[in-house]
Amino acid sequence: MNVPEKYKEYDELLKTKLDDYRYIHSLGVAKSARHLAELYGADPEKAYFAGLLHDVMKNAAPEEQLQMIKKADIMLSPSERLNRKLWHAIAGAAFLKLELHITDEDIIGAVRWHTTGKANMTQLEKIVYLADFISEDRKYPDVDKVRELSEQSIESAMLYTQRYCISKLLADG
């Protein structure tokens, strides 16, 4: 996948911060986010950029993730504190702000909420959340259904993914 010239600096950064799988995944999320933004009337460039950087802290050690979160004066909720899998999104949003000096709160929010979602998500937050679910590298059992729904209705796709995640959490105990 070719990265547009204006994002080459960030592409190079990702190559130093992510393993090969996560790097390819990030390119796929960026591509899917751009497509969904075009489909649903959001800014395709912001969607691509947020998708590209959504996992920037994914391969960082938990201590490094926590350090970035603390540096940004972010207070973790009790459930966030207990679940390390959530830290990369929070740390990623902090990294965008503190290290990359990104000031667009829509992009920062899309990175912050791409793992859990939240009530009253912005269009860009929904797009990056879904793009993470449907990127080309994803192979989970319902991925084709989510891809199909994401082409028809962003709200239906969001509802389906939330239900899917809840049922998976319940099944996994």
Show where each model-derived region lies.
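Charged phosphate-binding loop/patch that engages nucleotide di/tri-phosphates or the phosphate backbone
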Residues: 168-173
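Divalent metal-dependent catalytic cores for phosphoryl transfer on phosphate-bearing substrates
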Residues: 9-16, 36-162
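Non-catalytic interface/linker regions that flank or bridge core catalytic/transmembrane domains
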Residues: 1-4
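A short, charge-rich alpha-helical start-of-domain segment used by transcription regulators
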Residues: 20-22
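N-terminal glycine-rich anion-binding loops that anchor highly charged ligand groups
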Residues: 25
